[in-house]
Amino acid sequence: VEGEKAGPAPGTLYGVGLGPGDPELMTLKAARVIARVPVLAVPVKSPGAESFARGIARDHIRADHTLLELVFPMRSDPEVLRPHWERAAGALAAHLLAGRDAAFLCEGDPFTYGTFVHVFTQITRDHPHVPVRVVPGVSAYHAAAAATLTPLADTDDRVAVLPATYGVEVVEQVLERFDTVVLLKVKPVMDALLDLLERKGLTPHAVFVNR
């Protein structure tokens, strides 16, 4: 309508990877984005619970930051998690549509098996005019390879990365096709994985790293 005042330009949503846990593995860009934005969002597994992402970035969080604790229960069922993704996206969108930049802090890398992927999908679908930027982070398996001096790939090696919770049958198929297999979320199927590795004679070549 002519003469009607336009609303503020939307803020930018940043997905900020913080790395695997060591604050010294945060990138300079991650630190700069955190310093620049007024709103920070951190994932928690329940209201008031400790946030691992917040702990990594604690030295960069200021008293004047608006801090959003977004609840994502430790569940795997998408139907259970979807309302939490929607609420998180809505809480962020309220700030973004008011013109405030916001950073979603993620352990590891934002686009590698992270909660940010779901929030990103929701916001870009519902608010396609909101700018989004992603700051990559060091993934846990890269840090694990470095800590154990285990090269992941060389020359023509084939590498697969997948959650072990896909099932031992899937893992066995992947082991047949790839030179290096990185398994995430192994604890729920640890016994079955150990049996598989023993059966295939791969136990001497396996490395387990825990946080």
Please report, for each region that a protein language model flagged, where it lies by residue:
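Short, acidic/turn-prone active-site loops that include or flank metal/cofactor-
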Residues: 20-21, 45-48, 72-73, 138, ...
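Small/polar loops that bind or transfer phosphate-bearing groups
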Residues: 17-18, 104, 136, 162-163, ...
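A contiguous loop/helix-start segment that scaffolds small-molecule binding in enzyme catalytic cores
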Residues: 10-13, 97, 174-211
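Class I S-adenosyl-L-methionine
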Residues: 1-23, 28-131
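Class I SAM-dependent methyltransferase SAM-binding "motif I" and its flanking Rossmann-like core
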Residues: 3, 107-177
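Structural motif
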Residues: 43-45, 165, 184-188
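Short gly/pro/ser/thr-enriched loop/turn and capping motifs at secondary-structure boundaries
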Residues: 47-50, 75, 139-142, 190-191
